[in-house]
């Protein structure tokens, strides 16, 4: 069976992609060599018996998801749902009269509560109805304070690994009922099993063997987009394998710093990650396109990073060859897309979220003046010209035009 090679699109941060845009993305990544598209939807999909789940959030209807699924099947892409069944669903708790009883604390569901599992079953009944695949990502990442809110009041202080493992078993019983094969993010299980805050720190990994009682059918996804260190990736792959379950890797195509992408760093991190994945062995991989803080960056802006990842996974590290393939697929030059990165490199040096803090810097108060250079205006004027002079924009004329106008604004 062909291993998963996928892209995950974040459709939860106030920017649910239009059906036609998802189809276009699926077409592009299929040409690049990907076989899977994942839709990350925290509360942005219709759920049976839950009218307020995703209400006023631009959620996908069942009809829309069926349309996307049918199209992906037609072109040879497996559409996989990526949801949350423990944390990261803060928006539903705004409907206090409806969901307060299933809220532990923060954005975390209340483990052990019957109504929690009724909600989760409604999620699965919907998903099994609209998706062809039987694969599903059920989340469970970054539930840092699980068991420390309402759960603690009801049950007292307990080992948090035991809490999330019990929850995972209950959720997996539901996935089994619907014939689905679940995968989860690895971070909380590694941290709680080892009783550490930093999963990348040296630790006694033998503790995992004592707690490695995860459901038989679940897979673990090691996610990491923050390093260019091969050894770190290799270490964490081997650590995650100690749970004795299938292991997938999730890298990142950086779209979550603000308005500008970071293809350059994405490529460097991806190179190290894929080399570690190939050497250590994983059961599949995918690359996340997150939209933290309002999805200000276009998901199409990181197509160069995704092109590189697809080719690197095949063993191709010839950048000139990769650029030629990118041109064939998109009708645009690889290096022209990299101009978008330059919004965050005034003066030729990367400054994280530079375009964002310059844009929001109050002209009268100048709170961020200390982070700006007197030459930034000239830099952005030149970038505006570079973007304007791009001749081959393919079907991405609007994208180039948007960034050109943004550079024009930043030069002021």
What are these model-predicted stretches?
Residues 1-177, 183, 248-251, 256, ...:
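Feature activates predominantly on carbohydrate-active enzymes
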Residues 18, 24-27, 67-70, 76, ...:
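Substrate-binding groove of N-acetylhexosamine-processing glycoside hydrolases
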């Amino acid at each position: 069976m062909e291993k998963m090679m996928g892209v995950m699109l974040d459709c939860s941060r106030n920017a649910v992609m239009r059906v036609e845009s998802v189809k276009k993305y699926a077409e592009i990544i299929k040409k690049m060599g990907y076989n899977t598209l994942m839709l990350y939807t925290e509360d942005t999909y219709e759920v049976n018996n839950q009218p307020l789940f995703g209400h006023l959030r631009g959620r996908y209807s069942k009809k829309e998801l069926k349309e996307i699924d049918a199209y992906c099947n037609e072109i040879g892409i497996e559409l996989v749902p990526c949801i949350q069944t423990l944390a990261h669903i803060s928006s539903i708790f705004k409907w206090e009269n409806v969901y307060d009883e299933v809220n532990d604390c923060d954005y975390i569901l209340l483990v052990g509560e019957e109504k929690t599992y009724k909600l989760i079953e409604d999620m699965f009944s919907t998903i099994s109805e609209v998706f062809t695949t039987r694969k599903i990502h059920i989340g469970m990442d970054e539930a840092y304070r699980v068991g420390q809110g309402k759960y603690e009041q009801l049950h007292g202080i307990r080992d948090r690994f035991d809490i999330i493992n019990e929850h995972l078993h209950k959720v997996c019983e539901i996935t089994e009922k619907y014939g689905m094969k679940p995968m989860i993010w690895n971070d909380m299980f590694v941290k709680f099993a080892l009783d550490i805050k930093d999963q990348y720190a040296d630790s006694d990994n033998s503790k995992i063997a004592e707690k490695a009682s995860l459901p038989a059918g679940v897979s673990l996804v090691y996610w990491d987009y923050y390093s260019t260190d091969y050894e770190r990736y290799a270490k964490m792959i081997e650590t995650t394998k100690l749970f004795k379950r299938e292991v997938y890797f999730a890298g990142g195509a950086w779209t979550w710093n603000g308005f500008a992408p970071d293809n350059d760093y994405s490529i460097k991190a991806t190179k190290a990650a894929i080399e570690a994945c190939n050497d250590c062995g994983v059961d599949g991989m995918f690359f996340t396109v997150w939209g933290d803080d309002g999805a200000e960056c276009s998901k199409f802006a990181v197509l160069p990073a995704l092109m590189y990842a697809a080719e690197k996974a095949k063993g191709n590290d010839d950048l000139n060859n990769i650029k030629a393939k990118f041109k064939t697929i998109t009708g645009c030059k690889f290096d022209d897309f990299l101009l978008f990165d330059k919004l965050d490199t005034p003066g030729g040096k990367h400054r994280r979220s530079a375009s964002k803090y310059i844009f929001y810097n109050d002209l009268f108060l100048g709170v961020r003046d200390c982070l700006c250079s007197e030459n930034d205006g000239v830099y952005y004027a030149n970038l505006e010209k570079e973007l304007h002079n791009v001749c081959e924009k393919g079907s991405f004329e609007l994208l180039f035009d948007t960034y050109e106008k943004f550079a024009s604004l930043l030069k002021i």
